[in-house]
């Protein structure tokens, strides 16, 4: 899920009828790459008490989320609507990415009443009238030299504009932990996260270090795993982690402060037990 065709799939598969017949009233849908999204009795209770047909979870923005989609209110209809950055006019980009003007972003965790969704899908013959988003891609996402193509898609969260009684709810950052790039994967695999005995993320203030891996060597998962053969470095003491060039990491590497590795122009190695800081591989005297 994540794209708008999830609603058509639910309709055509007959799953909505099956769920209703089993006594289900609500659906929770999230992006499959959001590792923080999970059923919540607290959030579901808030949705049930709201009486709304549709609810979107939003979270506070950080600088890293400036380009994320946001829930705004339509001047024409007064309804909530999803605005992705690809849909923002160039003249409005600065305001749209200002976290003081738009402090929340769309997590794409949604809650919807099955009965209301069925009525809407029936009205539109199984295909909701969602705005089309244009994205530039390559035929092979792992090879930027392949043919350029235009991908047309719709966003699941855009359905918020079709429900007049739709609402938003602010949730903690722990409910939005997406893995879309290998930069995200570094954080999720690091010691900045801890699982409970129920294999859920521990509650906490999830302020992440800024990660920038050289896309020439780390963009694809095969290349990423080859260069982190043991595990990713410790990021517990890191504000940021930047890797320029082709570096392979040994065991028990620790990053601190604004850790930075420069491109040496050749394949390079971070030895076991090393400390990486602003000056590259450093001694452990910082402790």
Regions found by a protein language model. Name each.
Residues 1-67:
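Conserved beta-loop-beta/alpha segment of the NTase-like Rossmann-fold superfamily
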Residues 45-287:
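Left-handed beta-helix
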């Amino acid at each position: 899920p994540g794209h708008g065709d999830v609603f058509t799939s639910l309709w055509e598969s007959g799953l909505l009828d099956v769920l209703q017949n089993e006594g289900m009233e609500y659906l929770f849908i999230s992006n499959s790459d959001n590792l923080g999204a999970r059923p919540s009795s607290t959030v579901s209770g808030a949705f049930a008490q709201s009486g709304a047909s549709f609810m979107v979870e939003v979270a506070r923005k950080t600088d890293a989320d400036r380009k994320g989609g946001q829930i705004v209110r339509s001047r024409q209809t007064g309804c909530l609507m999803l605005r992705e950055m690809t849909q923002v006019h160039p003249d409005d980009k600065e305001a749209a990415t200002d976290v003081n003007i738009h402090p929340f972003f769309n997590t794409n965790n949604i809650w919807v009443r099955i009965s209301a969704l069925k009525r809407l899908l029936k009205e539109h013959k199984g295909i909701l009238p969602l705005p089309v988003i244009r994205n530039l891609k390559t035929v092979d996402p792992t090879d930027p030299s392949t043919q350029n193509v235009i991908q047309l898609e719709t966003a699941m969260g855009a359905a918020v504009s079709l429900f007049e009684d739709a609402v938003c709810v602010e949730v903690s950052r722990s409910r939005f932990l997406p893995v879309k790039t290998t930069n995200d994967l570094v954080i999720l695999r690091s010691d900045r996260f801890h699982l409970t005995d129920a294999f859920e993320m521990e509650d906490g203030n999830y302020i992440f270090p800024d990660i920038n891996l050289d896309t020439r060597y780390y963009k694809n998962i095969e290349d990423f795993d080859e260069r982190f053969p043991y595990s990713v470095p410790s990021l517990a003491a890191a504000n940021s982690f930047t890797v320029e060039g082709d570096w392979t990491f040994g065991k028990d590497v620790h990053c601190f402060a604004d850790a930075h590795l420069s491109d040496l122009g050749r394949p390079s190695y971070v030895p076991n037990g090393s400390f990486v800081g602003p000056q590259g591989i450093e001694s452990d005297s910082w402790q």
